[in-house]
Amino acid sequence: MRHPLVMGNWKLNGSRHMVNELVANLRKELTGVAGCDVAIAPPEMYIDLAKRAAAGSHIMLGAQNVDLNLSGAFTGETSAEMLKDIGAQYIIIGHSERRTYHKESDELIAKKFAVLKEQGLTPVLCIGETEAENEAGKTEEVCARQIDTVLKTQGAAAFEGAVIAYEPVWAIGTGKSATPAQAQAVHKFIRDHIAKADAKIAEQVIIQYGGSVNASNAAELFAQPDIDGALVGGASLKADAFAVIVKAAEAAKQA
């Protein structure tokens, strides 16, 4: 039985005051929640502050990106060792905004995946198609290609304990969302694709949905058998909205 994971990606948002206030409110809103893992990924400079604010709670820490180098002359970068040292566990890689704005390739993202696994951290591998790819019927082709870059270099075993976040690019920050049936079909395809290499690992890998998840559509999404939680953007900046999503995941997977 897969344990759901709901993770908040704060993106480029935050201040010391906001971090303390949001985490304090999350702690209140999530009191008693045990059936869903919860993680937040603040901007890097606030990870330690968020960790202290979340101390003693079930809220886990993550980060929004990582460099593939562990140390050296790489100005402006943050290594997996540093993230591990500061207490981040769930590390987002391959987010569509990184792929688009920073031209990150599938090959680079696969290398980041390997570095995180070597450091004992949990990669949250974002995959998904653009609107043009979706309209051209290439959703499965794109998702398979993005997964295969890891499978072919590291094998199916690399996905043990890892997380995949399916984020249809056309649904991120647009208010659009795939229907629960559409999302389920892609999630099932992803799981079946990994199962070709290793059925046992495919069955246990967490596959989140990451396309404009909010309080109103969360319950219906999580009722789908292959949707194991969510990677949440805008709604993760509001404690009450984020808590509704977490509780919906908990309720759906206990049903």
Curated annotation (Swiss-Prot):
Keywords: Cytoplasm, Gluconeogenesis, Glycolysis, Isomerase. Its EC number is 5.3.1.1. Belongs to the triosephosphate isomerase family. GO terms for cellular component: cytosol. The lineage of its organism: Bacteria, Pseudomonadati, Pseudomonadota, Gammaproteobacteria, Enterobacterales. GO terms for molecular function: triose-phosphate isomerase activity. It is found in: Cytoplasm. Pathway: Carbohydrate biosynthesis; gluconeogenesis; Carbohydrate degradation; glycolysis; D-glyceraldehyde 3-phosphate from glycerone phosphate: step 1/1. Involved in the gluconeogenesis. Catalyzes stereospecifically the conversion of dihydroxyacetone phosphate (DHAP) to D-glyceraldehyde-3-phosphate (G3P). The active site is at 95 (electrophile), 167 (proton acceptor). It comes from the Bacteria. Signal peptide: none annotated. This is Triosephosphate isomerase. Substrate binds at residues 9-11, 173, 212, 233-234. Its main location: cytoplasm. Homodimer. InterPro entries: Aldolase_TIM (IPR013785), TIM_sf (IPR035990), TrioseP_Isoase_bac/euk (IPR022896), Triosephosphate_isomerase (IPR000652), Triosephosphate_isomerase_AS (IPR020861). The gene is tpiA. It catalyses: D-glyceraldehyde 3-phosphate = dihydroxyacetone phosphate. PANTHER family: TRIOSEPHOSPHATE ISOMERASE (PTHR21139:SF42). One of its GO terms (biological process) is glycolytic process.
